[in-house]
Amino acid sequence: MARLQKHYRDTVINQLRERLGCQSVMAVPRIEKITLNIGAGEAVGDKKILERVMGDMARISGQKPVLTRARKSVAGFKIREDWPIGCKVTLRRKQMYEFLDRLINIAIPRIRDFRGLSPKSFDGRGNYNMGIREQIIFPEIDYDQIDAIRGMNITITTTAKTDEEGQALLRAFNFPFRTHT
């Protein structure tokens, strides 16, 4: 069992049950899945870029990424419908908790000029989105092996009904949210 999964089961459930006033253990919010997405629009000109992006994503997540394709043609971006333009990975269960552990304790502290995560990035239904500008904050990525620095989007989907419940859940996992000053 992953370290954060055990922490959730032993500590977080009881904390949130008291704080949110949940009647049942099953009513306590939990993390459903984590989705990682890299959009590589520059891959239109060079197909090798997409292979490198998918390799980076596989090393970061520990899972083979799925190719994402353009839904419709956009002349301004010089892309056609159904062209490969990025990749994504959906993590659940044990792999999700292991990635979350690495994200909170290793990757986020390595972000340059980090002042905390924005508490405004919730979507209104308790899910959290964050963007990362550099994939080199993850220890799995070797700085000498990358061809370009790329960002990614990380979406944490929870069963929380409101942003306050979602934020309470992520704070219980020690997410470094920015405090209002």
UniProtKB/Swiss-Prot annotation:
Q: Which superkingdom is the protein from?
A: Bacteria
Q: Biological process GO annotation list?
A: translation
InterPro entries in the record: Ribosomal_uL5, Ribosomal_uL5_bac-type, Ribosomal_uL5_C, Ribosomal_uL5_CS, Ribosomal_uL5_dom_sf, Ribosomal_uL5_N
Q: Name one GO cellular component term.
A: ribosome
Tell me if RNA-binding is a UniProt keyword of this record.
yes
Keywords from the UniProt entry: Ribonucleoprotein, Ribosomal protein, RNA-binding, rRNA-binding, tRNA-binding
Q: Name one Pfam family in it.
A: Ribosomal_L5
User: Does RNA-binding count among this protein's keywords?
Assistant: yes
The record's GO molecular-function terms, alphabetically, read:
rRNA binding; structural constituent of ribosome; tRNA binding
Hey, which family's this protein in? Answer: Belongs to the universal ribosomal protein uL5 family.
What does it do? This is one of the proteins that bind and probably mediate the attachment of the 5S RNA into the large ribosomal subunit, where it forms part of the central protuberance. In the 70S ribosome it contacts protein S13 of the 30S subunit (bridge B1b), connecting the 2 subunits; this bridge is implicated in subunit movement. Contacts the P site tRNA; the 5S rRNA and some of its associated proteins might help stabilize positioning of ribosome-bound tRNAs.
Assembly behavior = Part of the 50S ribosomal subunit; part of the 5S rRNA/L5/L18/L25 subcomplex. Contacts the 5S rRNA and the P site tRNA. Forms a bridge to the 30S subunit in the 70S ribosome.
What is this protein's record name? Answer: Large ribosomal subunit protein uL5
**This protein's encoding gene:** rplE
